[in-house]
Amino acid sequence: TKLLLAIDLGASGGKMFAGRLGGDVFRMEEIHRFEHEAASFFLPDSSGAVRERSCWDDTAIYREILRGLRLFRRHVGDRLDALGVDTWGADAQWVDADGEALGKVYCYRDHRLDNMVEEVRARISADRLYRLTGIHFQPFNLSNQVLWFATRRPRLLAAAAKLLPMPTLFNYYLGGCTQVDSTWASVTQMMDARRRVWSRPILAALGIPRRVLPVIVPPGSRVGLLQPALAQSLGLNRAVIVAVASHDTASAFAAAPADDPRDALIISSGTWSLVGRLIPRPVTSAAAMAANISNEGGIGNTRFLKNCMGAWIVQELLRVWEAADGRRMSWEEVDRLTPAAPPF
């Protein structure tokens, strides 16, 4: 029996599942769940102007991952064969040649990205960008984020040795791994959708050196082992770290309970709702571009989908109501009250 651990990180919370694979039977149980959210910082820039910045607390998320690993040790055992991390499909951390973080991890909802789509399009035509990547145009695409750093923080970019996407960042904390799988790389709007490599024309247009980007590997690749000292501190063996389908929607689509996923309409709903289907290869026609449909990497296929609003509106309402009266409403309470609420 193989003992596995899945670390599923969304934009508002995380879940960790212990899995047992033996013969033709796979069993899974949730062992840890936690909430997290971006924090607002009010930071002065080089001009002295104070600007609000929205950043992730990657240290807090990492601490919760360690808590989940300790719970695995307590409830499952001291043997762990493999683990994998998936995350939301935006944001990354810069590290220097010594492995030190260069600043905070910006959140994709930070307003510095509001006009970046237009800046990217000014450097490479929208038609060409879509033909190469098949990715829709959204402010949070990593292409917009790296252009912002290249144009607004050139000294940081000059000091950077590597850009670590969110799943890679936590694999790096756990085992020093710096690879990214193709499902996550696809949503950056910098990967060639057909060749599954970083697109040189796009990198040249954005002014991003290829050396700072991680190596792209197929989902399911073994990329490292738990650091020895970390494994010892957790009472575990040096488990294999796998670059899974690390864009959370890619993993969700792969696990969709459909008789034939190729003929199914799949909806993956969380903070965002992703609606689409699996197709053999990208469709980058003018009609697909006009509909703002994405061709995101899958496991041997392409996720042809539309990005829709999910539970984020409800999450924000819960946050505002808690700030107003100091009481945190549970999701169970939301479920109970929703049917009785008057329609708009």
Question: Which role fits each region the language model picked out?
Answer:
Residues I65-D81, R152-L157, R200-R210:
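Phosphate/pyrophosphate-binding loops at sites that engage ATP/ADP/AMP, CoA/4′-phosphopantetheine
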